[in-house]
């Protein structure tokens, strides 16, 4: 198997095993109960394009959460956030995410794959599985493609069946980042290619990702430990307060 095919096969396994069930309601509490690292993002409301991020960790699943630092600013989708697939029944309030809506997904999602321009050898501080972005690395957002919501090396596929994709190596804000395990068993049209990545500044916004300062992102990538089952918890501030006890959030 050549390098491109190996990359594609590995990515398919990783992204397909992130735990998000298409067409199935996700039970966030068991995920949170097992986790020892949380990246918590809250926004003032559903249409807010800015918010805050704070890191929490604990020694064991039975230990109390402790904050690692003070909140830092983030930007989200150009039209705010919306309930991601698997979380449609959590609340009667709030929109539901769809492809191209410019909204970042709300819910609880695994964080277990890093990416960047640099080769793996120069990213040794990153403990997550890591993908070096090549000129041929695409994230497919074409809902008609068999590769929808998948990061692939287009040079390794027998037939490129998509007409729309992010050419990731061409995006400067993807110099470093983390794949969010959203819509991993893809529900067509419910959103794709969701990442944590470098922002263009505090007044910017994204197409549906969560972005922030590069130095903080590099710190986060070195902090994330796959053995601690890290999660992204992304909610409006009101929903975080409402769900805090039920989901056993910090």
Outline where the language-model segments fall.
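Bacterial N-terminal signal peptides that target proteins for export
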Residues: 1-11
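Residues that recognize and position ribonucleotide moieties
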Residues: 210
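Cell wall/extracellular polymer interaction/catalysis modules
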Residues: 23-207, 216-250
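Conserved "landmark" site that anchors the functional core of diverse proteins
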Residues: 213
């Amino acid at each position: 198997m050549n390098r491109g095919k190996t990359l594609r096969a590995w990515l398919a396994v990783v992204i397909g095993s992130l735990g998000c069930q298409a067409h199935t309601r996700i039970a966030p509490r068991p995920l949170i109960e097992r986790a020892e690292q949380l990246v918590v993002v809250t926004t003032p409301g559903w249409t807010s394009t800015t918010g805050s991020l704070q890191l929490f960790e604990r020694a064991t699943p039975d230990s109390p959460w402790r904050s690692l630092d003070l909140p830092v600013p983030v930007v989200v989708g150009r039209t705010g956030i919306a309930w991601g697939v698997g979380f449609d029944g959590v609340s009667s309030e709030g929109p539901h995410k769809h492809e191209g809506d410019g909204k970042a997904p709300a819910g609880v999602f695994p964080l277990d794959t890093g990416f960047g321009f640099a080769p793996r050898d120069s990213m040794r501080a990153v403990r997550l599985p890591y993908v070096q972005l090549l000129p041929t690395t695409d994230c497919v957002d074409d809902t008609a493609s068999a590769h929808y919501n998948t990061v692939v090396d287009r040079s390794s596929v027998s037939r490129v069946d998509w007409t729309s994709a992010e050419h990731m190596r061409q995006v400067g804000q993807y110099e470093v980042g983390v794949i969010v395990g959203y819509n991993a068993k893809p529900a067509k049209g419910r959103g794709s290619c969701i990442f944590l990545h470098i922002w263009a500044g505090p007044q910017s916004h994204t197409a549906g990702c969560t972005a922030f300062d590069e130095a903080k992102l590099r710190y986060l990538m070195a902090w994330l430990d796959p053995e601690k089952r890290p999660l992204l918890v992304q909610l409006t501030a009101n929903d975080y307060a409402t769900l805090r006890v039920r989901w056993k959030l910090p």
